[in-house]
Amino acid sequence: MKNGEVFQYDKRDSQGTHVTPVSCEAFDFVRYAEYEESLKERQKEFLEADEGILVYRRVRADGVFYDKCRDWKESLELQLGALQKSLEYQADIANFLEPWYGIGYIAGCFGGEYEFLDGQAPAVRPMFHSTEELLAAAPEKIENTPAGRQILEMTEYFMDRTKGKLPVSLTDVQSPINM
């Protein structure tokens, strides 16, 4: 940034796409399965080749990677809307669901707590001021932290609601250096 400029933390995700939320009952699981199946031969050829390119066009529902992560139902329905929208595009890899709940869950293992600014992704205030402080800290198991439990329960919710018919990724894996 140039001298005097301020980071615009209130700007939304430039990759976010406006989508219409879709309930599990209204989502076309058959169409998605057919789309995903139609890509497998190309993926197999890519994996067996010495070189090549696969095109991945992620349709990210606006808000899911911000404040919409707090409401599992809303996040899932927005992501289902994004999956449905993604079927309109030629790609080599099908889109998937992501039970995203911020990138601060590793910080949560060290006692960090999420802070939600209006309309923004969850944040964690800096906790360590040196590498020595970080190395001396004793982390908690992720399943024993509020953010960790939220992610695990949200993943289970996504799997239950879709009956395991859609791919669900791990949440966004981050480094403890983010603390």
Describe the function of each predicted region.
Residues M1-M179:
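Catalytic cores of TIM-barrel enzymes
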